[in-house]
Amino acid sequence: MPSFDIMSEVDLPSLKNAVDVANRKISGRYDFKGSDARVEQGEKVLTLFGDSDFQIDQMRQILLPEMTSKKIDVRCLEYGDLQKIGGNKLKQELKVRVGVEQDLAKKIVKLLKDSKLKVQAAIQGEAIRVSGAKRDILQEAIALVKKEITDFPLQFGNFRD
């Protein structure tokens, strides 16, 4: 029985590369001279440090195109609130969402069941396994999910015949 997986993954080495390039651009910009503006990468979080909300906004405008050029979908970022960290320094955390969250997975499974396509969908951890009788039905399921779920980056892989 043919099947495929719906998942959401981020290429972490490409993300690190994008952060490094953004930091080089930030350190070379005139309007950031003398400030402690930088982007730090944690396990699944990016932290922007700056002197003002304007600087943090400018750093986002540098970082996001770098991520796009490295083929990282920026919809995987969840923006945190601006936080004061002593003096006139600010930070903002950008959480990198990896894996399909449970509520989104349930929404996708419900979407596939309500579509009357002859497919079975099962949540398997941070991925969704979709199986059907024919490859054509699976392709229709992919098209349906791509059309309906636009606010979160999804990848379709692990095809089996």
Curated annotation (Swiss-Prot):
Classification via Gene3D superfamilies: 3.30.70.860, YajQ-like, domain 2 (3.30.70.990)
Recorded superkingdom: Bacteria
Keywords, ordered alphabetically: Nucleotide-binding
Pfam family, one: DUF520
InterPro entries listed in its UniProt record: DUF520, UPF0234-like_C, UPF0234_N, YajQ-like_sf
GO terms under cellular component: cytosol
GO molecular function: nucleotide binding
Function, as annotated: Nucleotide-binding protein.
Family membership noted in the UniProt record: Belongs to the YajQ family.
Protein name stated in the entry: Nucleotide-binding protein AZOSEA28950
Organism listed in the record: Aromatoleum aromaticum (strain DSM 19018 / LMG 30748 / EbN1) (Azoarcus sp. (strain EbN1))
